[in-house]
Amino acid sequence: MTNPTTGPTRHRRRSTRAVTIACAGVAVVAVAVSVAAVSLAGSRSESKAGAASPVAATATTGAPATATTAAASPSASAGKPSSAAPSSAPSASKAPAAGSGAPAPKGGWIFVDQAAYQKQVDAYKARKTDPVPSGVGNLPEFRADCKYSHRRADDPIVFPGLPGASHMHSFVGNKAVDADTTAGDLMKFTASTCKPVVDHSAYWVPTLYEAGSNKPVETTGFRVYYRSLRQKSDDIKPMPNGLRMIAGDAKKKVPTPRGAQGQFYCAFYGPGDLDGIARSENGNWPICGEPATFHFMLQFPDCWDGKHLDSPNHKDHIAYGNENGCPSSHPVRIPAITFDIQYGAKGTKAGYYLSSDPQGKSASSFHGDAFVMWDPDAMNKRVKNCVLQRKTCDNDGYYR
Protein backbone atom coordinates (compact mmCIF):
# COMPACT_ATOMS: atom_id res chain seq x y z
CA MET A 1 0.00 0.00 0.00
CA THR A 2 1.23 3.47 -0.85
CA ASN A 3 2.55 5.50 2.06
CA PRO A 4 -0.34 7.75 3.15
CA THR A 5 2.05 10.52 4.07
CA THR A 6 2.82 11.17 0.40
CA GLY A 7 -0.40 13.15 0.05
CA PRO A 8 -0.77 16.81 1.05
CA THR A 9 -1.31 17.93 4.60
CA ARG A 10 -4.39 19.92 5.48
CA HIS A 11 -2.34 23.11 5.61
CA ARG A 12 -0.36 22.74 2.40
CA ARG A 13 -1.36 23.01 -1.25
CA ARG A 14 -0.17 20.54 -3.81
CA SER A 15 -0.10 20.83 -7.57
CA THR A 16 -2.79 19.00 -9.53
CA ARG A 17 -2.48 17.19 -12.78
CA ALA A 18 -4.19 18.37 -15.93
CA VAL A 19 -7.65 17.11 -16.72
CA THR A 20 -9.95 16.88 -19.68
CA ILE A 21 -13.62 17.22 -18.86
CA ALA A 22 -16.28 16.14 -21.30
CA CYS A 23 -18.22 19.22 -22.35
CA ALA A 24 -21.90 19.83 -23.06
CA GLY A 25 -23.10 18.36 -26.30
CA VAL A 26 -21.13 15.16 -25.88
CA ALA A 27 -23.33 12.20 -26.72
CA VAL A 28 -23.05 9.42 -24.19
CA VAL A 29 -25.54 6.60 -24.24
CA ALA A 30 -27.30 5.63 -21.04
CA VAL A 31 -25.59 3.18 -18.75
CA ALA A 32 -27.32 1.16 -16.06
CA VAL A 33 -25.42 1.40 -12.80
CA SER A 34 -26.71 -0.47 -9.79
CA VAL A 35 -25.54 0.97 -6.49
CA ALA A 36 -26.39 0.43 -2.86
CA ALA A 37 -25.50 2.45 0.20
CA VAL A 38 -22.34 1.13 1.77
CA SER A 39 -22.25 -0.15 5.32
CA LEU A 40 -18.84 0.42 6.88
CA ALA A 41 -18.10 0.21 10.58
CA GLY A 42 -15.35 1.56 12.70
CA SER A 43 -15.70 5.30 12.24
CA ARG A 44 -15.40 7.70 15.13
CA SER A 45 -17.25 10.90 15.85
CA GLU A 46 -15.44 14.07 14.83
CA SER A 47 -12.60 15.11 17.10
CA LYS A 48 -12.95 18.75 16.16
CA ALA A 49 -15.94 21.04 16.47
CA GLY A 50 -17.30 22.30 13.16
CA ALA A 51 -17.70 25.83 14.43
CA ALA A 52 -16.61 27.34 11.13
CA SER A 53 -19.28 25.43 9.25
CA PRO A 54 -22.62 27.20 8.77
CA VAL A 55 -24.59 24.01 9.41
CA ALA A 56 -22.48 21.20 10.83
CA ALA A 57 -23.09 20.29 14.47
CA THR A 58 -21.26 18.15 17.01
CA ALA A 59 -21.56 14.37 16.97
CA THR A 60 -23.77 12.86 19.67
CA THR A 61 -22.94 9.67 19.61
CA GLY A 62 -30.66 -0.63 -2.99
CA ALA A 63 -31.55 0.19 -5.91
CA PRO A 64 -31.09 3.87 -6.78
CA ALA A 65 -33.49 6.28 -8.32
CA THR A 66 -32.18 7.71 -11.58
CA ALA A 67 -31.69 10.90 -13.47
CA THR A 68 -33.66 11.66 -16.57
CA THR A 69 -31.16 12.64 -19.20
CA ALA A 70 -30.68 13.07 -22.92
CA ALA A 71 -27.94 12.64 -25.49
CA ALA A 72 -27.13 16.33 -25.17
CA SER A 73 -26.03 15.78 -21.60
CA PRO A 74 -22.53 14.44 -20.90
CA SER A 75 -24.01 12.34 -18.13
CA ALA A 76 -25.69 8.98 -18.43
CA SER A 77 -28.81 7.65 -16.78
CA ALA A 78 -28.38 5.33 -13.83
CA GLY A 79 -31.47 3.25 -14.55
CA LYS A 80 -35.19 3.64 -14.04
CA PRO A 81 -36.63 4.30 -10.58
CA SER A 82 -39.24 2.03 -9.15
CA SER A 83 -42.84 3.18 -9.12
CA ALA A 84 -43.48 1.40 -5.85
CA ALA A 85 -43.85 3.35 -2.63
CA PRO A 86 -40.56 4.23 -0.99
CA SER A 87 -39.40 1.94 1.75
CA SER A 88 -38.99 3.05 5.32
CA ALA A 89 -35.61 3.48 6.99
CA PRO A 90 -32.87 1.64 5.10
CA SER A 91 -31.78 -0.22 8.21
CA ALA A 92 -32.86 -0.84 11.77
CA SER A 93 -30.31 1.44 13.42
CA LYS A 94 -32.12 3.75 15.78
CA ALA A 95 -31.24 7.42 16.01
CA PRO A 96 -30.96 8.96 19.47
CA ALA A 97 -33.13 11.85 20.54
CA ALA A 98 -31.53 15.24 19.93
CA GLY A 99 -29.99 16.71 23.03
CA SER A 100 -30.18 13.42 24.92
CA GLY A 101 -26.65 13.96 26.26
CA ALA A 102 -25.80 10.28 25.84
CA PRO A 103 -22.11 9.47 25.30
CA ALA A 104 -21.19 9.26 21.63
CA PRO A 105 -20.34 5.74 20.43
CA LYS A 106 -17.79 5.26 17.68
CA GLY A 107 -19.38 5.92 14.33
CA GLY A 108 -22.15 7.87 16.00
CA TRP A 109 -24.91 10.13 14.83
CA ILE A 110 -24.00 13.72 13.99
CA PHE A 111 -26.85 16.19 14.39
CA VAL A 112 -27.41 19.02 11.96
CA ASP A 113 -27.48 22.52 13.41
CA GLN A 114 -31.23 23.02 12.98
CA ALA A 115 -31.14 26.79 13.50
CA ALA A 116 -28.44 27.26 10.86
CA TYR A 117 -30.15 24.95 8.39
CA GLN A 118 -33.52 26.62 8.92
CA LYS A 119 -31.85 29.96 8.23
CA GLN A 120 -30.54 28.56 4.96
CA VAL A 121 -33.96 27.16 4.01
CA ASP A 122 -35.65 30.48 4.82
CA ALA A 123 -33.17 32.29 2.59
CA TYR A 124 -33.79 29.70 -0.11
CA LYS A 125 -37.56 30.21 0.04
CA ALA A 126 -37.20 33.99 -0.03
CA ARG A 127 -34.83 33.94 -2.99
CA LYS A 128 -36.34 34.89 -6.34
CA THR A 129 -35.55 32.82 -9.40
CA ASP A 130 -33.52 34.42 -12.15
CA PRO A 131 -35.14 34.97 -15.56
CA VAL A 132 -34.57 32.11 -17.97
CA PRO A 133 -33.25 33.01 -21.43
CA SER A 134 -34.46 31.15 -24.49
CA GLY A 135 -32.72 28.01 -25.64
CA VAL A 136 -31.79 26.77 -22.16
CA GLY A 137 -31.61 23.02 -21.59
CA ASN A 138 -34.26 21.31 -19.48
CA LEU A 139 -32.12 18.88 -17.50
CA PRO A 140 -32.67 19.87 -13.83
CA GLU A 141 -29.07 19.96 -12.66
CA PHE A 142 -26.01 21.98 -11.76
CA ARG A 143 -22.48 20.65 -11.57
CA ALA A 144 -18.87 20.90 -10.48
CA ASP A 145 -15.97 19.79 -12.67
CA CYS A 146 -13.06 18.53 -10.60
CA LYS A 147 -9.46 17.50 -11.14
CA TYR A 148 -7.50 14.85 -9.30
CA SER A 149 -6.05 16.29 -6.08
CA HIS A 150 -4.20 13.67 -4.04
CA ARG A 151 -4.09 10.06 -2.92
CA ARG A 152 -4.12 8.93 0.72
CA ALA A 153 -5.05 5.87 2.79
CA ASP A 154 -7.46 8.10 4.73
CA ASP A 155 -11.23 8.37 5.05
CA PRO A 156 -12.55 11.25 7.22
CA ILE A 157 -16.08 9.79 7.09
CA VAL A 158 -15.43 6.13 7.90
CA PHE A 159 -12.16 6.45 9.83
CA PRO A 160 -12.02 10.04 11.13
CA GLY A 161 -8.86 10.80 13.06
CA LEU A 162 -7.18 7.55 11.99
CA PRO A 163 -4.57 8.28 9.31
CA GLY A 164 -3.66 5.25 7.23
CA ALA A 165 -6.60 3.18 8.51
CA SER A 166 -8.42 3.05 5.17
CA HIS A 167 -7.66 1.49 1.83
CA MET A 168 -6.18 3.96 -0.64
CA HIS A 169 -8.50 6.71 -1.89
CA SER A 170 -8.19 9.16 -4.76
CA PHE A 171 -9.48 12.60 -3.74
CA VAL A 172 -10.87 15.46 -5.80
CA GLY A 173 -12.18 18.81 -4.64
CA ASN A 174 -10.96 20.27 -1.37
CA LYS A 175 -7.15 19.99 -1.34
CA ALA A 176 -6.76 19.91 2.44
CA VAL A 177 -8.56 16.63 3.10
CA ASP A 178 -6.99 13.95 5.27
CA ALA A 179 -8.15 11.66 8.08
CA ASP A 180 -8.60 14.57 10.51
CA THR A 181 -10.75 16.75 8.24
CA THR A 182 -13.94 18.10 9.80
CA ALA A 183 -16.78 20.14 8.36
CA GLY A 184 -15.21 23.26 9.83
CA ASP A 185 -11.95 22.49 8.04
CA LEU A 186 -13.71 22.33 4.67
CA MET A 187 -14.99 25.87 5.18
CA LYS A 188 -11.68 27.13 6.58
CA PHE A 189 -9.31 25.57 4.03
CA THR A 190 -11.14 26.21 0.78
CA ALA A 191 -8.50 25.61 -1.93
CA SER A 192 -10.12 23.18 -4.34
CA THR A 193 -9.58 21.35 -7.61
CA CYS A 194 -13.25 21.86 -8.45
CA LYS A 195 -14.92 24.59 -10.44
CA PRO A 196 -16.86 26.48 -9.17
CA VAL A 197 -14.62 27.66 -6.34
CA VAL A 198 -17.70 28.09 -4.12
CA ASP A 199 -17.84 24.29 -3.88
CA HIS A 200 -15.59 23.48 -0.92
CA SER A 201 -16.73 19.85 -0.77
CA ALA A 202 -14.50 16.79 -0.78
CA TYR A 203 -15.21 13.79 -3.00
CA TRP A 204 -13.27 10.53 -3.13
CA VAL A 205 -13.28 7.01 -4.58
CA PRO A 206 -11.10 3.90 -4.17
CA THR A 207 -7.90 4.09 -6.20
CA LEU A 208 -7.79 2.10 -9.44
CA TYR A 209 -4.61 0.10 -10.17
CA GLU A 210 -3.25 -1.74 -13.21
CA ALA A 211 -3.07 -5.42 -12.27
CA GLY A 212 0.02 -6.02 -14.40
CA SER A 213 2.16 -3.21 -13.01
CA ASN A 214 0.40 -2.25 -9.74
CA LYS A 215 0.56 1.35 -10.91
CA PRO A 216 -2.29 3.68 -9.86
CA VAL A 217 -4.60 4.99 -12.56
CA GLU A 218 -6.01 8.37 -11.62
CA THR A 219 -9.06 10.17 -12.94
CA THR A 220 -8.78 12.42 -15.97
CA GLY A 221 -12.26 13.84 -15.51
CA PHE A 222 -14.54 13.97 -12.47
CA ARG A 223 -17.89 15.70 -12.89
CA VAL A 224 -20.22 15.96 -9.90
CA TYR A 225 -23.86 16.55 -10.75
CA TYR A 226 -26.45 17.84 -8.30
CA ARG A 227 -29.78 17.03 -9.92
CA SER A 228 -33.38 15.97 -9.71
CA LEU A 229 -33.99 12.27 -10.31
CA ARG A 230 -37.74 12.68 -10.74
CA GLN A 231 -40.27 14.27 -13.04
CA LYS A 232 -41.06 17.09 -10.59
CA SER A 233 -38.86 19.24 -8.37
CA ASP A 234 -41.33 21.34 -6.39
CA ASP A 235 -40.41 19.77 -3.02
CA ILE A 236 -36.63 20.05 -3.39
CA LYS A 237 -34.58 21.63 -0.57
CA PRO A 238 -30.95 22.78 -0.48
CA MET A 239 -28.37 20.41 0.97
CA PRO A 240 -27.14 21.07 4.50
CA ASN A 241 -23.45 21.79 4.83
CA GLY A 242 -21.47 19.03 6.51
CA LEU A 243 -23.64 16.24 5.07
CA ARG A 244 -21.67 13.02 4.65
CA MET A 245 -22.77 10.39 2.16
CA ILE A 246 -21.49 7.12 0.76
CA ALA A 247 -22.80 5.33 -2.34
CA GLY A 248 -21.79 1.87 -3.47
CA ASP A 249 -20.53 -1.05 -1.39
CA ALA A 250 -16.82 -1.36 -0.59
CA LYS A 251 -17.42 -4.87 0.75
CA LYS A 252 -19.09 -6.23 -2.38
CA LYS A 253 -16.84 -8.79 -4.06
CA VAL A 254 -18.48 -10.41 -7.08
CA PRO A 255 -17.41 -10.72 -10.72
CA THR A 256 -18.28 -7.92 -13.16
CA PRO A 257 -18.45 -9.67 -16.55
CA ARG A 258 -19.72 -8.17 -19.79
CA GLY A 259 -23.24 -6.83 -19.28
CA ALA A 260 -23.05 -6.79 -15.47
CA GLN A 261 -24.34 -3.81 -13.55
CA GLY A 262 -21.97 -1.70 -11.51
CA GLN A 263 -18.96 -1.98 -13.80
CA PHE A 264 -16.63 0.30 -15.71
CA TYR A 265 -17.69 1.04 -19.27
CA CYS A 266 -16.19 2.53 -22.41
CA ALA A 267 -17.27 5.95 -23.67
CA PHE A 268 -16.07 8.72 -25.94
CA TYR A 269 -17.36 11.35 -28.38
CA GLY A 270 -19.70 9.13 -30.34
CA PRO A 271 -21.46 5.76 -30.43
CA GLY A 272 -19.61 2.62 -29.47
CA ASP A 273 -19.68 -0.59 -27.47
CA LEU A 274 -20.02 0.30 -23.79
CA ASP A 275 -18.75 -3.14 -22.80
CA GLY A 276 -15.64 -2.70 -24.93
CA ILE A 277 -14.32 -4.58 -27.94
CA ALA A 278 -12.82 -7.27 -25.69
CA ARG A 279 -12.43 -8.17 -22.03
CA SER A 280 -9.58 -8.70 -19.59
CA GLU A 281 -8.41 -12.28 -19.00
CA ASN A 282 -10.66 -12.59 -15.95
CA GLY A 283 -13.56 -11.00 -17.84
CA ASN A 284 -14.15 -8.28 -15.23
CA TRP A 285 -12.80 -5.29 -17.16
CA PRO A 286 -13.55 -3.93 -20.63
CA ILE A 287 -10.93 -3.26 -23.27
CA CYS A 288 -12.05 -0.14 -25.09
CA GLY A 289 -11.88 0.52 -28.79
CA GLU A 290 -10.32 3.74 -30.05
CA PRO A 291 -10.75 6.43 -28.83
CA ALA A 292 -12.88 5.32 -25.87
CA THR A 293 -11.61 5.22 -22.28
CA PHE A 294 -12.87 3.94 -18.91
CA HIS A 295 -15.85 5.64 -17.28
CA PHE A 296 -17.86 4.98 -14.14
CA MET A 297 -21.11 6.51 -12.90
CA LEU A 298 -22.26 6.44 -9.29
CA GLN A 299 -25.64 7.60 -8.00
CA PHE A 300 -26.19 8.88 -4.44
CA PRO A 301 -29.50 8.98 -2.51
CA ASP A 302 -31.84 11.97 -2.75
CA CYS A 303 -33.74 11.74 0.55
CA TRP A 304 -32.52 12.89 3.97
CA ASP A 305 -33.92 12.39 7.48
CA GLY A 306 -33.65 16.13 8.19
CA LYS A 307 -31.86 15.53 11.48
CA HIS A 308 -28.43 14.00 11.00
CA LEU A 309 -25.35 14.79 8.95
CA ASP A 310 -24.05 11.24 9.44
CA SER A 311 -25.04 7.94 11.03
CA PRO A 312 -23.14 5.00 12.55
CA ASN A 313 -23.05 3.08 9.26
CA HIS A 314 -23.00 6.27 7.14
CA LYS A 315 -26.24 5.36 5.36
CA ASP A 316 -29.15 5.39 7.83
CA HIS A 317 -29.57 9.18 7.61
CA ILE A 318 -30.15 9.08 3.83
CA ALA A 319 -32.30 7.00 1.49
CA TYR A 320 -33.32 6.61 -2.14
CA GLY A 321 -36.72 7.96 -3.12
CA ASN A 322 -38.76 7.48 -6.29
CA GLU A 323 -41.58 9.13 -8.22
CA ASN A 324 -43.89 8.60 -5.24
CA GLY A 325 -41.61 10.69 -3.07
CA CYS A 326 -39.29 10.11 -0.16
CA PRO A 327 -39.92 7.54 2.60
CA SER A 328 -41.54 8.92 5.74
CA SER A 329 -38.35 8.17 7.68
CA HIS A 330 -36.39 10.45 5.32
CA PRO A 331 -38.89 13.16 4.33
CA VAL A 332 -36.51 15.89 3.11
CA ARG A 333 -35.81 15.72 -0.59
CA ILE A 334 -32.38 17.04 -1.58
CA PRO A 335 -30.51 17.20 -4.89
CA ALA A 336 -29.09 13.82 -5.88
CA ILE A 337 -25.33 13.75 -6.34
CA THR A 338 -24.05 11.78 -9.33
CA PHE A 339 -20.37 11.05 -9.94
CA ASP A 340 -19.49 10.93 -13.66
CA ILE A 341 -15.87 9.75 -13.65
CA GLN A 342 -13.44 9.41 -16.55
CA TYR A 343 -10.10 7.59 -16.55
CA GLY A 344 -7.31 7.59 -19.10
CA ALA A 345 -7.19 3.78 -19.02
CA LYS A 346 -8.31 1.88 -22.11
CA GLY A 347 -8.11 -1.66 -20.74
CA THR A 348 -5.52 -4.46 -20.76
CA LYS A 349 -5.56 -8.26 -20.77
CA ALA A 350 -4.10 -8.24 -17.26
CA GLY A 351 -7.01 -6.12 -16.08
CA TYR A 352 -7.19 -3.89 -13.02
CA TYR A 353 -8.10 -3.91 -9.36
CA LEU A 354 -9.51 -1.45 -6.85
CA SER A 355 -7.83 -0.61 -3.55
CA SER A 356 -11.06 -1.76 -1.87
CA ASP A 357 -10.65 -5.29 -3.29
CA PRO A 358 -7.09 -5.95 -4.53
CA GLN A 359 -7.54 -9.74 -4.48
CA GLY A 360 -10.89 -9.88 -6.28
CA LYS A 361 -9.77 -7.81 -9.26
CA SER A 362 -13.34 -6.84 -10.15
CA ALA A 363 -15.19 -3.52 -10.14
CA SER A 364 -17.97 -4.55 -7.75
CA SER A 365 -16.48 -2.82 -4.69
CA PHE A 366 -16.42 0.59 -6.36
CA HIS A 367 -17.95 3.24 -4.11
CA GLY A 368 -17.80 6.95 -3.51
CA ASP A 369 -17.84 9.42 -0.62
CA ALA A 370 -19.14 12.97 -0.57
CA PHE A 371 -18.49 15.43 2.27
CA VAL A 372 -20.68 18.38 1.27
CA MET A 373 -19.63 21.98 1.89
CA TRP A 374 -20.79 24.89 -0.31
CA ASP A 375 -21.15 28.59 0.08
CA PRO A 376 -24.79 28.55 1.32
CA ASP A 377 -25.99 31.30 -1.01
CA ALA A 378 -24.34 29.60 -3.99
CA MET A 379 -26.07 26.33 -3.11
CA ASN A 380 -29.42 28.09 -2.68
CA LYS A 381 -29.10 29.90 -6.01
CA ARG A 382 -28.33 26.73 -7.93
CA VAL A 383 -31.04 24.62 -6.33
CA LYS A 384 -33.62 27.37 -6.90
CA ASN A 385 -32.67 28.31 -10.46
CA CYS A 386 -31.51 24.98 -11.83
CA VAL A 387 -33.15 22.08 -9.99
CA LEU A 388 -36.41 23.67 -8.86
CA GLN A 389 -37.01 25.35 -12.24
CA ARG A 390 -35.77 22.20 -14.03
CA LYS A 391 -33.17 24.02 -16.09
CA THR A 392 -29.62 23.01 -17.00
CA CYS A 393 -26.85 25.08 -15.43
CA ASP A 394 -23.10 25.21 -15.93
CA ASN A 395 -20.29 25.22 -13.37
CA ASP A 396 -20.88 28.86 -12.49
CA GLY A 397 -24.59 28.31 -11.93
CA TYR A 398 -25.69 30.03 -15.13
CA TYR A 399 -28.28 28.63 -17.50
CA ARG A 400 -26.95 26.83 -20.54
Please provide the spans of the model-predicted regions.
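N-terminal export/membrane-targeting signals
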Residues: 1, 25-28, 36-40
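N-terminal low-complexity, Pro/Thr-rich disordered segments
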Residues: 34-134, 393, 400
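Compositionally biased, intrinsically disordered low-complexity segments
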Residues: 29-32, 58, 145
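Sec-dependent N-terminal signal peptides
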Residues: 17-29
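Terminal targeting segments of Actinobacterial cell-envelope proteins
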Residues: 1-19
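Primary mode marks residue(s) on the alpha4-beta5-alpha5 output face of response regulator receiver
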Residues: 94-166, 170-298, 305-400
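A ubiquitous, low-specificity "background" feature that marks scattered single residues
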Residues: 13-14, 38, 52, 173, ...
